[in-house]
Amino acid sequence: MRASALALVLTAALLAGCGSSGSSGTTAKPNGEASKPASRVLADAEAAATNARSAHISGDITSGGTPITVDLTTARGKGGKGSMSTNGLKFDLVRIGDTVYVRGSDAFYKHFAGAAVAQLLHNRWLKGSATHGRLKSLAELTNLRSLFAHISADPGKIVNDGKTTYKGQQVVTLRSVGDDSKLYVAATGKPYPVAIVGNKNGQSGTVTFGDWNKPVSLSAPSDALDISQFGG
C-alpha cells in the first residue's frame, strides 16, 4: 500500500489531476468499507481496481530525492497510454495488446543510448514486445493489475483510520504505520482507490486514480521503429 512501493515500480520501469471516481452507479450509497479491517479494505480496493474496464492514474512523487511525474490511462485487456518523466527523462507510451510503443525525449534517448543515437531517434517512436525484452517493464505501467500487485504486496502494518473527506469525496483512510503514507478508498459505491499520499521517509507526493470505466481510445503510432532490429 505504501507510496514508496508505487514510486519504486515507476522508477524501476523507467530505469530497466485528480480524476473523478468514475461510474459506480447513479446513487452513491455507503459501501461499508469504513467498518472493515484495513487488510480487507485493501483487498477490496485492489479487486475493484483490477476488475475495472479502465482507469486514469496521475500525479507527482518524490522518491529518495528523485521527482517522478506520471499520467497514464489503462484499459483492461486492451492496453494503455500516457507519459512519465523523472529527472528530466520523459517518454510517451502506448500499449496495444502485446505490442508497446515508446517515444522518448532527446534527454531520454541520450541517457540510454548516447548522443549520436538520440539525434537519430529525435521524435521517433520505437516499438517492441510488451511481454519480453527491453520494453516489457515499461509496458507493465499500463497494466493496472501489475501496478496494484506492487502496491499491495507486503504492505506492512496498516490501519483503517475510518471515514473522511478527500477533495470533496467521501473516502476511507488506510494508513501505513511504517511510513505514514495513506491510501484513500471510496467510501460510497465501489471501493475504488482514490489517491495515494506519501508523507515521509524520502517519499512524498500524491498519485490519484479516477475516470473508472470510461471509454479509452488507443491507436498505434505510425512509422515506429522495431526495436528488434537493434537487438532488443
Named regions from a protein language model:
Residues 2-69, 223-232:
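N-terminal leader/targeting segments and the immediate start of mature chains
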Residues 3, 18-19, 55-58, 100, ...:
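Primarily hydrophobic membrane-targeting regions of prokaryotic envelope proteins
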Residues 40-108:
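N-terminal mature ectodomain segment of secretory-pathway/periplasmic proteins
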Residues 60, 162-225:
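Gly/Pro-enriched, hydrophobic low-complexity segments
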Residues 88-89, 108-110, 191, 201-202:
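Short, surface-exposed beta-strand-loop junctions and turns on beta-sheet-rich folds
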Residues 103-146:
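Acidic/charged, solvent-exposed loop-and-adjacent secondary-structure segments enriched in E/D, K/R, S/T
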Residues 151-159:
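A short, amphipathic edge element
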